């Protein structure tokens, strides 16, 4: 067993109440530094809940029954994982920002939470925005979310996530509601971040095009369980589970094997 990454073991999540419904059951994943793991599955398969459960940020009405996270072989408290060890980019960037606060205010808030807010904060924020390809970062820092496009907001979310300097990044459907050109730019940005910083990236998606474009390894979810996992080429060329075959067949019918290793 490798000990140089982030491992999620035995994660089980259920609804509250006398008769709980299992939503995620016995999920195990491994995210390695410098590699991209795609967690893929149909809507409702448990992908986003898996991310939320691993980071101890589950929504109301559900609870984690079991599961642990190991970093380089050592168990970590889930409550302390987010921010220090794992940065996150969640769905729908527009809803992630307070509409009455500027991007500068959000950036300062992030730096304060990290204990890094000082007289150099403005320069740090400008550099962070430049690093994700936001043009005229000084102007962008003065904008509110409603003044920005979806692509700009997604880049801003990535910039704030990278301020944490965490070795792992969870990205939950980062290209949802973006047009194809902006999607490609965001994926290129994430790919570059992994290559340049050696981050381990877990990307949650239902889009096999994103998987083909970005992933090194793939884990397929169906009905709250991991039903298949392996290198991206193996998943596309030799899918074993019915859920995987359905996802691959739908993608191949539209795009063929273009871009798949």
Curated annotation (Swiss-Prot):
Q: Name one GO molecular function term.
A: ATP hydrolysis activity
Which residues are in coiled coils? none
Q: What Gene3D superfamilies is this protein classified in?
A: P-loop containing nucleotide triphosphate hydrolases
> What are the UniProt keywords, alphabetically?
ATP-binding, Cell inner membrane, Cell membrane, Ion transport, Membrane, Nickel, Nickel transport, Nucleotide-binding, Translocase, Transport
Membrane topology category? Peripheral membrane protein
Main subcellular location of this protein, as a coarse class? membrane
Query: So what does this thing catalyse?
Result: Ni(2+)(out) + ATP + H2O = Ni(2+)(in) + ADP + phosphate + H(+)
List of residues binding ATP: 41-48
Q: Which InterPro entries match?
A: AAA+_ATPase, ABC_Ni/Peptide_Import, ABC_transporter-like_ATP-bd, ABC_transporter-like_CS, P-loop_NTPase
Xref: CDD domains: ABC_NikE_OppD_transporters
Family note: Belongs to the ABC transporter superfamily. Nickel importer (TC 3.A.1.5.3) family.
Instruction: Cite the record's note on assembly.
Output: The complex is composed of two ATP-binding proteins (NikD and NikE), two transmembrane proteins (NikB and NikC) and a solute-binding protein (NikA).
Under which name does UniProt file this protein?
Answer: Nickel import ATP-binding protein NikD
Q: Which gene encodes it?
A: nikD
